Amino acid sequence: VEQFKNENHYWLYDYALYLTMKDTGLSIKSKSMIQEDLEKKLVKDSTFSFHCFVQYEFYKQWNDLKRYCNEKGIGLIGDLPFYVSYDSSDVWANPHLYLLDKSLEPIGVAGTPPDYFSEEGQSWGNPLYDWKAMKKEKYDWWVKRIAFHLKHHDALRIDHFRGFEKFWYIPNDETTDARKGHWEKGPGLDLFEQYERQFGSAPIIAEDLG
């Protein structure tokens, strides 16, 4: 368990801390707002250890399954959502990587414009990435995210792949009307070139629908 915690500290610590905070009834908008003594108290709580152990046990069993499938000549394809939830450890621990206002509320949300699937478009409610902030950190959050999932899968399908090229920005005061959104430019190949510099080519399947 300790080895797993050390190898996955970059995401597991924040994830377990976030869930421990919620389980104990606390409501703190971002990790940076937690006082040091409170953070130490939460980390020592058995709830924190429980959430770490659940992840350890899940990936232990998952990797056993993957190994068995690979031995039988079967590969596993992961399916990665493009966006994350506002109510997540990702946003909570890294608010600077999302388009949020001073009170840490989304200034815009994700969705799609009107098309033949929906005359009114779609408003998903997910917070949008701050791609300028991501670029300053060499897309480290995304690079690690892709690398992690490829470690546990033989190939990775990324949903809403077109969002890397451009994405539909719906102002937060218009979240009920996706028609009032507009297109914004995404990171494009820059993100994947950064990934390749660190990890080489990747077996990625791009959703070609939307």
Residue map of PLM features:
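Alpha-amylase-like alpha-glycosidases and glucanotransferases acting on alpha-linked glucans and related
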Residues: 1-59, 84-210
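Conserved, well-ordered alpha-helix/loop/beta-strand core segments that scaffold catalytic motifs
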Residues: 51, 56-84
